[in-house]
Curated annotation (Swiss-Prot):
This is 5'(3')-deoxyribonucleotidase. Pfam families: NT5C. It comes from Clostridium acetobutylicum (strain ATCC 824 / DSM 792 / JCM 1419 / IAM 19013 / LMG 5710 / NBRC 13948 / NRRL B-527 / VKM B-1787 / 2291 / W). Its cofactor is Mg(2+). Its EC number is 3.1.3.-. Dephosphorylates nucleoside monophosphates such as the 5' and 2'(3')-phosphates of deoxyribonucleotides in vitro. GO terms for molecular function: 5'-nucleotidase activity; metal ion binding. It is an enzyme of class 3 (hydrolase). One of its GO terms (biological process) is pyrimidine deoxyribonucleotide catabolic process.
Length: 180
C-alpha cells in the first residue's frame, strides 16, 4: 500500500527565515524590529519607509538561505514521519535561491531525497494529502488537508487547523493518517 503524502513548506515552517530576515534587516537599517512586531504577511508594512519593498532584496542575497536555522523538533519530527508518509518539501520561491534552499535541505534533512523537493509558485497545483504551511494564502488553494504552522504574521488567521510547533504538527499528521 502506498503511503499518504505530506507536503511541508520550507520558509518559517522548517527554517527560521522570519528571525534571520528581521535580524539582517536590523543590521542594514539600524532598526530594532522583532519578529513578533510583524502581524501580517506583507513585511514591507513593518519596516522603515526607506526600506519598504527593498526588504525582499535580502532574500536574494547570495547564501542567505544557507545560514538559516531549523525550527525546534522539526528534524526529529520529519524523520519519524517518514515511516508513515512520503514527505515532500514544497517551497514557493524565487528561482535565484533554489540552489541555496536545496543545499540547505540536503544538509539539514539528508533523509529527504532531492526528488521530493518541489519549487513552485502556486501550491494549489501540488496534489498531496496534507500540507503544512505558515502562509494562509498557500492553504486557501490547496485541495487536501491543511495545517497552518504558527507564526507571528498569521496569529489572526482562524480558518485552518493550527500547529503551534513541530510537536503539534507531528501529532496532527499522525491523527490524520487513518483518514487518508
Amino acid at each position: 500500500m502506498n503511503k499518504p503524502t505530506l507536503g511541508i513548506d520550507l520558509d518559517t515552517t522548517l527554517n527560521t527565515l522570519d528571525r534571520e530576515w528581521v535580524k539582517r534587516y536590523n543590521e542594514i537599517y539600524k532598526d530594532k524590529l522583532l519578529p513578533s512586531d510583524i502581524k501580517g504577511w506583507d513585511i514591507e508594512n513593518y519596516v522603515k519607509p526607506e526600506c519598504g519593498k527593498k526588504i525582499y532584496d535580502i532574500l536574494k542575497e547570495p547564501h542567505f538561505f544557507r545560514n538559516l536555522g531549523v525550527q525546534p523538533f522539526a528534524e526529529t519530527a520529519l524523520e519519524e514521519l517518514t515511516s508513515i508518509f512520503n514527505i515532500y518539501i514544497v517551497s514557493a520561491t524565487h528561482y535565484k535561491v533554489c540552489e541555496d534552499k536545496g543545499n540547505w535541505i540536503k544538509e539539514k534533512f539528508p533523509f529527504i531525497s532531492y526528488q521530493n523537493i518541489i519549487f513552485c509558485h502556486n501550491k494549489g497545483l501540488v496534489h498531496l494529502d496534507i500540507l503544512i504551511d505558515d502562509n494562509p494564502l498557500n492553504l486557501e488553494n490547496f485541495k487536501g488537508n491543511k495545517i497552518l504552522f504558527d507564526a507571528h504574521h498569521n496569529k489572526s488567521e482562524n480558518r485552518f487547523v493550527r500547529a503551534r510547533d513541530w510537536y503539534e504538527a507531528k501529532a496532527l499528521c499522525e491523527s490524520l493518517k487513518d483518514f487518508l
